[in-house]
Swiss-Prot record:
May contribute to the transparency and refractive index of the lens. Belongs to the small heat shock protein (HSP20) family. It comes from the Eukaryota. It comes from Squalus acanthias. The lineage of its organism: Eukaryota, Metazoa, Chordata, Craniata, Vertebrata. GO terms for molecular function: metal ion binding; protein homodimerization activity; structural constituent of eye lens; unfolded protein binding. Pfam families: Crystallin (PF00525), HSP20 (PF00011). Residues 155-177 are annotated as: Disordered. InterPro entries: A-crystallin/Hsp20_dom, Alpha-crystallin/HSP_16, Alpha-crystallin/sHSP_animal, Alpha-crystallin_N, HSP20-like_chaperone. The gene is CRYAB. Keywords: Acetylation, Eye lens protein, Metal-binding, Zinc. This is Alpha-crystallin B chain.
Amino acid sequence: MDIAIQHPWLRRPLFPSSIFPSRIFDQNFGEHFDPDLFPSFSSMLSPFYWRMGAPMARMPSWAQTGLSELRLDKDKFAIHLDVKHFTPEELRVKILGDFIEVQAQHEERQDEHGYVSREFHRKYKVPAGVDPLVITCSLSADGVLTITGPRKVADVPERSVPISRDEKPAVAGPQQK
């Protein structure tokens, strides 16, 4: 069974109202100003704040978004999490009871738009049949954190179950003569 966590871009209407976003995550913090939204206001700002390109061209590709995917197969489970903005030293994976907790944080640093600091916490429930003691974690060169664990498959041998026959009826009711 595959459970894909969709990015909010995929759950939006085709042409959303970007002036007044309905959810906090629909607000594009840290992005450039789009002069098409407020024409009278745009003349007061420096062109360095303007956003270039059409709105559809600004949609991030899959590789640029912080997606997470949970895959649950019959013999194993895997969590894939995009953490490319963090170094291995800034990541922490813990198992607390039946939950896997992933934390990442880095201090303020400069990027192409200015200064940014990032932090996130994610919790995943350990699937049934997975021993938390054998869960492993690895970080790929392109910044994908993979958490895996084998599922216990019960090796119950097949056997035939004999059928016995009772002389009494299963449902008590009026006696037929």
